[in-house]
């Protein structure tokens, strides 16, 4: 898999220059997930931002449960892993063979020291992505997210 191509195709990095994408791609590792296996399971530590280079991941609340949605080439998963420690809230099951470019928290910390501008731009892109998702959320999910944000500000 071409890590640069996987990251260049990511919506999260749409405003990055090729130089910025290359810097991030060099910090990533490649990971393959075979069809019918899990990239990660709900409750496991979330330690990396994953760029989907090829394939389809289905998100499930429980193993073998109904799919909540699908992520494909150009999508990312684990967006908060670089910003805060926590667990995966859902499981990611490979509906097809999947190729990921994985930016581990440790590699991001090294990048933060060596290339602070690129890491800051990534953090801003993650924050913008979260804001867009919050605006697009509806119903109980939107109310829950708004409550979580207001609770932290109190």
What is each residue range found by the language model?
Residues 1-154:
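Cytosolic regulatory regions built on CNB/CRP/Popeye-like sensor folds
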């Amino acid at each position: 898999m071409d890590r640069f191509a996987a990251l260049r195709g990511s919506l999260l990095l749409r405003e990055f220059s090729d130089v910025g994408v290359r810097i991030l791609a060099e910090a990533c590792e490649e990971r393959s997930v075979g069809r019918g296996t899990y990239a990660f399971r709900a409750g496991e530590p979330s330690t990396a931002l994953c760029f989907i280079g090829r394939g389809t991941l289905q998100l499930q609340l429980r193993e073998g449960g109904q799919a909540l949605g699908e992520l494909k080439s150009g999508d990312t998963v684990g967006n908060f892993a670089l910003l805060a420690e926590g667990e995966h809230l859902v499981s990611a099951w490979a509906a097809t063979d999947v190729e990921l470019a994985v930016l581990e928290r440790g590699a991001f910390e090294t990048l933060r020291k060596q290339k602070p501008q690129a890491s800051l731009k990534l953090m801003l892109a993650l924050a913008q992505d979260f804001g867009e998702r919050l605006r697009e959320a509806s119903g109980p999910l939107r109310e829950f997210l708004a409550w979580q944000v207001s609770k932290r500000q109190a």
